[in-house]
């Protein structure tokens, strides 16, 4: 937290006087609607075109500013595919700098996912055909250019990638995209007086404003009934604690790579960089409710954000406003889902590896990333036990593989919370069981390491070859 100056005191007094005159209802009424990214589906062999290019948007006070994104929009469209599809993907780089792309969570051969070895220079394209073999999951695509992934993702090179399967279609889960199945991409940003993104070259990046699908503190009109929220933490360094402002319980149904064994009733869910969760909230009784990060704020809390260098100006993620008549309500309290994730806990005699993340020096086991060095060699079908620890809390992710969390600080993870994952938050020590189902090569290795992209760009990464 920065030191307090006389100017800060004067500033806080003016703000307090101003805010005290504004009713909460008026502040809520000034919200902008949530932007729903366009939906691209690979139906009947239709190619998916993703063109990286500059675009224009307005973050504050209708001030247009240049951003990056895909197909003419800030951020990317939501790509939705089906298990069993062969997806024709067509990237095109219309930016002025080279970009490498990754589909985080996609389970496929390394030469098809993209990654740091697949760099598209300005004006270049790439068109892989992706076999979709994994069950239902929420993945995302983003820039992973070596030493430049944080800046490029921050500017807008990120989008959601949804995989559906037969079980999804047969379930009673909400599945109308943008209506009761809502994508929410979280990014914190710094903006200057012109409304332009500011990127500071610091060890970690913590912005002052929280954007959701590119909009600050938005609202969304939703039908009465169950609403499904798919949340992606696309922030560079910041983690979030998701809760509702009225402290209501909601249902956690899935993490990055698939469903939990059954719905879990919770009041708070944490989200590290690169993590995704799927939530269900019961809005069958109507009314409005707001999803926030952290605690509900009063006037003094809002004034206090002036003095903090790492607090968000507004901690609202989205306000859900119900409309229409009450729909048929299915109580999801005891819904069960098909998943083989818990079976991994019974495996024995696995190779054990330990990784220590020195956050201050951006190293893993005292080494920074070296493109010509292979850090891990393993085989397809192998299951390994990894023990992760860090000098300070930090996000972790792995490409091309999946894992289950076995223990956190030597305490077993509850059976009800076991799901396939590819990202997590290290706060102390975490034990995971990693499954390698797909091959990679020395030219296109899988990458693991910090999901804090600022740290990753400094070298907090490692490479994996799976034969």
From Swiss-Prot:
Keywords: Cell cycle, Cell division, Periplasm, Signal
A Pfam family per the record: Cu-oxidase_3
CDD domains, per database record: CuRO_1_CueO_FtsP, CuRO_2_CueO_FtsP
Biological process (GO), any one: FtsZ-dependent cytokinesis
Maturation and modification: Predicted to be exported by the Tat system. The position of the signal peptide cleavage has not been experimentally proven.
Gene Ontology molecular function, alphabetical: copper ion binding
Cell location: Periplasm
Entry keyword Signal: yes
Signal sequence, start to end: 1-28
UniProt-listed PANTHER family: BILIRUBIN OXIDASE, CUPREDOXIN SUPERFAMILY PROTEIN
Function noted in UniProt: Cell division protein that is required for growth during stress conditions. May be involved in protecting or stabilizing the divisomal assembly under conditions of stress.
Family: Belongs to the FtsP family.
This protein's name: Cell division protein FtsP
Classification of source organism: Bacteria, Pseudomonadati, Pseudomonadota, Gammaproteobacteria, Pasteurellales
């Amino acid at each position: 937290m920065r030191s307090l100056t006389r100017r800060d005191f004067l500033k806080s007094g003016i703000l307090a006087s101003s805010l005290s005159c504004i009713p909460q209802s008026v502040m809520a009424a000034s919200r902008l609607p949530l932007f729903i990214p366009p939906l691209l589906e690979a139906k009947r062999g239709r190619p998916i075109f993703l063109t990286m290019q500059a675009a224009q948007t307005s973050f504050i006070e209708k001030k247009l500013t240049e951003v990056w994104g895909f197909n003419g929009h800030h951020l990317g469209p939501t790509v939705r595919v089906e298990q069993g599809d062969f997806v024709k993907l067509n990237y095109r780089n219309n930016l002025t700098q080279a970009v490498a792309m990754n589909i985080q969570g996609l389970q496929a051969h390394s030469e098809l996912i993209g990654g740091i070895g697949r760099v598209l220079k300005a004006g270049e394209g790439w068109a892989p055909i992706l076999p979709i073999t994994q069950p239902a999951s929420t993945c995302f695509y983003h820039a992973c250019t070596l030493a430049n992934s944080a800046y490029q993702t921050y500017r807008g090179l990120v989008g959601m990638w949804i995989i559906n399967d037969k079980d999804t279609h047969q379930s009673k889960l909400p599945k109308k995209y943008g209506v009761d199945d809502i994508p929410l991409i979280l990014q914190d940003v710094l903006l200057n007086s012109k409304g332009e993104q500011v990127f500071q070259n610091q060890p970690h990046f913590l912005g002052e404003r929280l954007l959701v699908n590119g909009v600050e503190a938005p609202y969304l009109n939703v039908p009465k009934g169950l609403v499904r929220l798919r949340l992606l933490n696309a922030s560079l360094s910041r983690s979030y604690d998701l809760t509702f402002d009225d402290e209501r319980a909601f249902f956690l149904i899935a993490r990055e790579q698939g469903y939990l064994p059954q719905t879990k009733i919770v009041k708070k869910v944490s989200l590290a960089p690169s993590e995704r969760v799927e939530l269900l909230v019961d809005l069958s009784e109507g009314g409005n409710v707001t999803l926030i990060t952290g605690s509900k704020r009063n006037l003094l809390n809002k004034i206090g954000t002036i003095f903090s260098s790492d607090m968000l100006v507004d901690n609202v993620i989205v306000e859900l406003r119900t409309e229409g008549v009450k729909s048929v309500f299915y109580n999801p309290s005891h819904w069960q889902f098909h998943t083989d994730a818990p079976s991994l806990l019974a495996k024995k005699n696995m190779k054990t590896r330990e990784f220590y993340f020195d956050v201050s020096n951006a190293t893993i086991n005292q080494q920074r990333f070296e493109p010509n060095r292979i850090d891990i060699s393993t085989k397809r079908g192998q299951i390994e036990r990894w023990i992760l620890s860090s000098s300070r809390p930090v996000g972790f992710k792995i490409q091309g593989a999946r894992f289950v969390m076995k223990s956190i600080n030597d305490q077993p993870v509850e059976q009800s919370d076991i799901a396939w994952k590819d990202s997590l938050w290290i706060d102390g020590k975490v034990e995971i069981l990693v499954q390698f189902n797909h091959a990679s090569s020395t030219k296109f290795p899988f990458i693991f390491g910090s999901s804090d992209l600022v740290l990753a760009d400094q070298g907090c990464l490692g490479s994996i070859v799976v034969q």
